[in-house]
């Protein structure tokens, strides 16, 4: 999600604080000054005397780690129906984006806020979870994947951190909540999520138990839909530390087994520091083309296997069409290069 200018201003006010010991608390406290956030919190708190709402997951992790935050996720101890009623009472627009899984998306001044009811897993099959709504915060935290993603905060910046995720984040450790193999079997997409978070946050070596659990259950990744798989890889590819992948033999081996079509991962390690830090600003399809274009029919197979949209398919095939031409000085002219950048920029 690319924030609107208004969202950028909001996030700048909220999250870019001075570097001091009160960083976390001051970052969260500033949110109260924002109209949109304040409206949502007031709507939930006024619904009943026992209703609670907290920030959760990525936005809390990023605030603690002093990162740019591009979305805000919220957790509540109300049922989805009660969340809808609470928003209706305050005339806040919303849509039921994932109500079966407990998620309501509030919309204020074109800013989206995902509000999810506390849950516990009743059944899992490696792809989807059957959930039951709860009012127990630790129960909700225990179903999350990693300790660094199970940190909650109220509007004042007071943390609820039952699995010491803040400590792991500060120490550069990426730990599953509970047994790694059990958590992977609940949702095999966690294999890719582990790699993304490890490359971005780890300051240590892999826990051998985690790597063994991943390799033991790697075949389960094939049960994940191509859409979910590619969406998660997109987050990995556009993350700030993707270039580290080629230097991490465990992660590289796993990615090569999941995506054998990626032929040129090592090329990213050769980019300069400026380029590596700006991955997230580069269009996904353009980055993807670097991985899959190799002068064979690899691109066609990748498009078929991952069911790319017509727009993405067109762009990838366009970039592929220039692969052989770039080695022929007679046909590959400056205008061809300009066309590539124009086409890529226009469609990005």
Predicted features by range, described:
Residues 4-348:
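Catalytic cores of the polymerase beta-like nucleotidyltransferase superfamily
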